[in-house]
Amino acid sequence: MILVTGASGFVGRSVVKALRTRGKEVRCFIRTPYREKTVADYHVEMAYGDILSLSALKGAMRGVDTVVHLVAIIREKRNENFDLINRRGTEIVTQAAREEGIRHFVHMSANGAQDNPSYPYLHSKWQGEQAVISSGLTYTIFRPSIQFGDGDEFINTLAGMIKAFPLVPVVGLGKIRLQPISVDEVGAMISLVIDNPR
């Protein structure tokens, strides 16, 4: 059994689809009850809770041998900041995984994650990675680039801007290279690493 945190999110839906396509049993950890409809077609188990709740996570991990941790935020809100969700949340998920004897922990980080507080999002993702690395668990960390697909917020917004205006935005004076990846490709890669922990 595989537990996917953030299963109802943009990446989570693709991961769940890829895992189920490969015949894997999946339990989805979802915070907001009505969001299960986004993965209901895949015939998965549901567990509800918050990644900041150790007891909810441990309950969801019973009978699970692999955890795919996808919960993260890319924009801060009043009650959710990068440190709380991306760092502390990952620490709590790894603690629950360790205490429940999880065999393999798969963590989704971000391309460019770094130990530099000048970039709060990337720094929080790096701190999350450190929590995974120091957890004692067998782990795999993914650092995908910007992802596109149904429901993405970046590429679709960029495409809309290009359609609306005759200008194409240039990132970093044109010297920064972006190599977007399909969210379905990310889901497929995560589903493949489940059987090959490294």
Language model feature labels by segment:
Residues 27, 73-74, 82-145:
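Conserved Rossmann-fold NAD(P)-dependent oxidoreductase catalytic core, especially the SDR/UDP-sugar
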